[in-house]
UniProtKB/Swiss-Prot annotation:
Gene (UniProt): Lias
Tissues in which the UniProt entry reports expression: Expressed predominantly in heart, testis, and liver.
Organism this protein belongs to: Mus musculus (Mouse)
Record Gene3D superfamilies: Aldolase class I
Binding site for [4Fe-4S] cluster 1: C105, C110, C116, S351
SUPFAM superfamilies: Radical SAM enzymes
Official protein name in the record: Lipoyl synthase, mitochondrial
Length: 373
């Protein structure tokens, strides 16, 4: 998802210059500051930082947002991201390599990797650790993680190594996710639960979010993870029911995912449940609204909505680039439907750090309330 520096400059350069190729008559009616900007042209920072997107309003964007037959959509300006860099970014990357750990941030090419790993406004670095290796037994058409029928065996040292890494970073909120491991008897539930236990042993105050597979619908595996001591149980439905077969591996489906989320709350009512939906795959507004209602009916607490971005040419094409204004609309709808938290934006992902600050406070409040009862 994240673009390399040169690819970014090369692919976006023609769009940026082309967008500002005005006639002399059009230029004469512009404010002085904008004339000066057009005269000087964009610099390198405009290509890599997203600053250019702030110089015009989104409703002025003239490019196509919906894909026509046979075409590939161009990236709109609001989806440009900063190139990852900084001390925190390098520190996290080095620790991961030394302990042979993987992150979904890298494997899924997340566009927020620089912001989350580098810290940002809150100066707190966040990485989503991907357990059970870097190879998945599923083949979802939106995902860039490697796939194989028989991935390498689980690393017995991974739970302890993960706890060591988190302790070294000094984080107080961590997200654990994993590949699907249909080749393992319990889908890896015991492995995930053990990792949570190791984290809590080293730091009882740490808050742990687990973004889990569907475990082939095995509710005993769901229960094992839900009762492991985690604070947030997340499982992504990914898209609306009507697009499940097109987007996800045939072994996954909406109803199965809904049962996973519902069962986690049934066996551990104090856990915060969370899911995520990608937009831009061809869904309709009516389908999105019905999906949100179904999630609330299953007692899902938190929701994230983000733009689907095609990771490689082999994956599903983007059908539509949803505007930031439309994402704001879905955030409002989610809050009106009763979700405790709705994060909705083009670059929002299920593990996006903005939600974690809210969830941290939400979990803390629930624990305080429970202790007073």
């Amino acid at each position: 998802m994240a673009l390399r520096c040169w690819d970014t400059a090369r692919s976006l350069g023609s769009r940026i210059f082309g967008r500002y190729a005005f006639t002399v008559r059009a230029l004469s009616s512009l404010p002085d500051k904008k004339k000066e900007f057009l005269h000087n042209g964009p610099d390198l920072q405009d290509f890599v930082s997203g600053d250019l997107a702030d110089k015009s309003t989104w409703d002025e964007y003239k490019g196509n947002l919906k894909r026509q037959k046979g075409e590939r959509l161009r990236l709109p300006p609001w989806l440009k991201t900063k190139i990852p860099m900084g001390k925190n970014y390098n520190k996290l990357k080095n620790t991961l390599r030394n302990l042979s750990l993987h992150t979904v941030c890298e494997e899924a090419r997340c566009p927020n990797i620089g912001e989350c790993w580098g810290g940002g406004e809150y100066a707190t670095a966040t990485a989503t650790i991907m357990l059970m290796g870097d190879t998945c037994t599923r083949g979802c058409r939106f995902c860039s993680v490697k796939t194989a029928r028989n991935p390498p065996p689980l690393d017995a040292n991974e739970p302890d190594n993960t706890a060591k890494a988190i302790a070294e970073w000094g984080l107080d909120y961590v997200v654990l996710t994993s590949v699907d491991r249909d080749d393992v008897a319990d889908g890896g539930a015991e492995h995930i639960a053990k990792t949570v236990s190791c984290l809590k042993e080293r730091n009882p105050k740490i808050l742990v979010e687990c973004l889990t597979p569907d475990f082939r619908g095995d509710l005993r595996a769901v229960e094992k993870v839900a009762l492991s001591g985690l604070d947030v149980y997340a499982h992504n439905v990914e898209t609306v029911p009507e697009l499940q077969r097109k987007v996800r591996d045939p072994r996954a489906n909406f109803d199965q995912s809904l049962r996973v989320l519902r069962h986690a709350k049934e066996v551990q009512p104090d856990v915060v449940s969370k899911t995520s939906i990608m937009l831009g795959l061809g869904e309709t507004d009516e389908q999105v609204y019905a999906t949100l209602k179904a999630l609330r009916a299953a007692d899902v607490d938190c929701l994230t909505l983000g733009q689907y971005m095609q990771p490689t040419k082999r994956h599903l094409k983007v059908e539509e680039y949803v505007t930031p204004e439309k994402f704001k609309y879905w955030e409002k709808v989610g809050n009106e439907l009763g979700f405790l938290y709705t994060a909705s934006g083009p670059l929002v992902r299920s593990s996006y750090k903005a939600g974690e600050f809210f969830l941290k406070n939400l979990v803390a409040r629930r624990k305080t309330k429970a202790s007073k009862v």
